[in-house]
Amino acid sequence: MFSYLGGKKFQAKWIARHFPKHKTYVEPFGGAYWVYFVANHQIDQAHTNVYNDFNKDIANIFYCARHKDRAFLKELLLHEPQNEDIFNLFKSDLIPFNTDFELGDVERATKYIYLQSQSFSGDTLNEKTKFINLKGKYRSKYEHFINKISNKKWLYHIKGINHIHNESYETIINEYDNDDTLFYCDPPYFKMEDYYVQDFQRHQHK
């Protein structure tokens, strides 16, 4: 739904073609959830779709888009796209990050997606994150995100996400593990674990 480190937007259809039949579809490392969105015509067979990400701000974006779509859209539209002053203000509000908030925080989700959509390739946000000035040559990814969550087709698939979690991958796998569940696991890139907000160690790839 947005640019994100390790997103599978362009590989999604190929990946989904190799999925076995299933009733529940789960991504323990949800990220931008591109495999679900791009290959939804193949995933629609699932009775239950489950999103999880250990990055609470990313999970919060999906929660707001799914359960508070009107309030989220209203908040998004309040802010001028491609404004460096707004970017820096939101950056000072959010960084360094904390997880002392509940899923459904629309204002926080708006600030996060504003930063995330206007930094290099949706890179993980930190103190060094810089504003990408498009100089009016292109529409910002912030505007593209607004278009998605106000589009009926995208809303249909957003509403098709039955459960949104902010848990460890172990917790999610243990909760949903059964013969009818398909887990698509796309963990942080090997040897690039430090690029992610969540604490995922190299040995955990095993």
Which residues fall in each region the model found?
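Residue-level signal for functionally critical sites in structured catalytic/ligand-binding pockets
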Residues: S3-F10, E27, I43-D44, N49-I58, ...
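Extended aliphatic helical segments
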Residues: V26, V35-V38, V50, V106, ...
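A short acidic (Asp/Glu
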Residues: F37-A39, I61, Y176, E193-V197
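SAM-dependent nucleic-acid methyltransferase catalytic core
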Residues: M1-A12, R66-Y184, P188-E193
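Glycine-rich S-adenosyl-L-methionine
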Residues: V197-K206
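SAM cofactor-binding core of SAM-dependent methyltransferases
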Residues: R17, K21-N98
